[in-house]
Amino acid sequence: MVDLFEKNEINGMTLSNRFIRSATWEGMATAEGACTPPLIDLMGDLAAGGVGLIITGHTYIREDGQHSPRQLGIHQDTLIPGLQNLTRCVHEHASKIVLQLGFGGAYLSKSRLRRMSSQDFQDLTEAYGQAALRARKAGFDGVQIFAAHGFFLSQMLCPRYNDRSDDYGGKITNRARALLEVLDGIRNAVGRNYPVLVKINCRDFVENGLTLEDSILAASMLEKAGIDAIELSGGLLNNPNIMRSKMDPEDTKGYFLSEARTFREKIQVPLILVGGIRSYEVARELVEDEVVDYIAMSRPFIREPGLIKRWRAGDRREAACISCDNCFEPIKKGEGVSCLPLEPEATETFFPQLSETVPASPPYPPGTGYKISIGLEDWQSNYIPVIKIQMALNGQILERSPSFPLGTQDHQKVTQAITDLLEKRTNIN
C-alpha cells in the first residue's frame, strides 16, 4: 500500500508528502503587487497544516501582465525582500513553496489587446526568465509556469484564441512554441537544477479548444525539454465548469480523472492532479494505481488549512469544504480569500448587461433552467467583466453556480449560450 506521507523529490526538492496546495487566488498583495503580512500568515498556516508543497497564486511577471487587483507581483527586484519573508515563514514549518509565474493575456486588466510580434515573444520569454531568477533569490524552492485556464500561454495552446499563421500558430508544435520558449528562457536564467513545473489544461472543454490529444503532445514536448512535473487542470476562465460548486458524489474522484489516466499512458514525468478531490481514500487510490504522483487541492485548504495534518493524525474524514465558492467573496472587498458561510442575502455587487435562460435536461423537473448573465462585477470600485451562471426553477434562483458534468448536453448548451451572449455584447460595445 502506498504511503502518501513518505518523503519524495522533484528535481532535488524534497517534499514531506504527496499533497500539494494548488495555486489559489489570494487577493492579499498591495496595489503594487508586494507581499503583505496577511499573505504571509495564510501561507504559514498552510505550511503548519502539513501540506508538502504550496504553489502560490499566479503572479505577474511584468507590470503590464497584471490580471486582477491585489495580485502578487514578481516583476521587479524591490519585491524580493517581502517575498523572502514569505518563503522564510513557510520553511520554518518544514514545507516547500513554489511561485507560479503568469501573464494575463486576453484577461489583462490594464492593457489593450493587440497581436504580438516576434520581438514581443522574445521580450516576454526574457521576462519569465528574470521573474524566475527573482523567485530563486527570494527563496522559493521552484517555479510553476501557468499555462492553464485561458491565460496567455493557455491561449497560445488553444485554437479558439490562437489563429496565427506564423511559427506560433496552426498545428500544436507551433502553438506550444511560446510555452517551450518560456521554459527554455527560465532554464537559461536559473539552470537545470532548479525545479520548474507547469500547469496546463488536459483539455479546454469548449468548441475549437485545446483537445486531450494535443495537450498530451504539448506535454510530451515539455517532457523532452526538461520540465520537472506537470499539473493537470481543465477549462477556461469563462467556462462554467472550471470550478464547480455543490459537487456531485462522483466529482469527489476528480474532475479530470479519465484525462489523467490517458496522460499517464504517454507521460513519464511526475503528474499532479487538481480538481474535485476531497477524500483521502480517493487520493491514496489515485497514487497507488499510479494514475498520478501528487494530489493537489485548492478550496479545501481555504476551509481547512490543517487538513493534511488531520489526515496524517489518522482522522481520515473527507475535507470539510462544501465547494460553495463563497471563499472568493471577501476578495471583492479587498479582504483576501477566506472561508465564509454561504449568504444568499449578501449585498449584490453584480450588474448584469445581458442574460439568457436555457432549459436544463432531465432529471431536472420542467421549468428548471440555467440563467446565464454577462455584466460587470464591482471589485473595490474596479468594474470587471464577469459571466455568471445560476440555476433557476420557474424564475426562482436555486443555486448561484450550478454543477453539471463536462461534455454533457447541458454543458454544451450553456457554453453556446455564453458564446452567443459574448457576441451580442461585442456588437453592443
PLM feature spans:
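Flavin-dependent oxidoreductase catalytic cores
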Residues: M1-T349
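Generic structural motif
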Residues: M13, G104, P344, E377-W379, ...
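Compositionally biased, intrinsically disordered low-complexity segments
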Residues: M13, H93, S361, G375-E377, ...
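Negatively charged, low-complexity tracts enriched in Asp/Glu with abundant Ser/Thr
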Residues: E348-T368
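A short, structured beta-strand/loop element
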Residues: T368-S403
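Mixed-charge, Lys/Arg-enriched low-complexity segments
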Residues: A392-N429
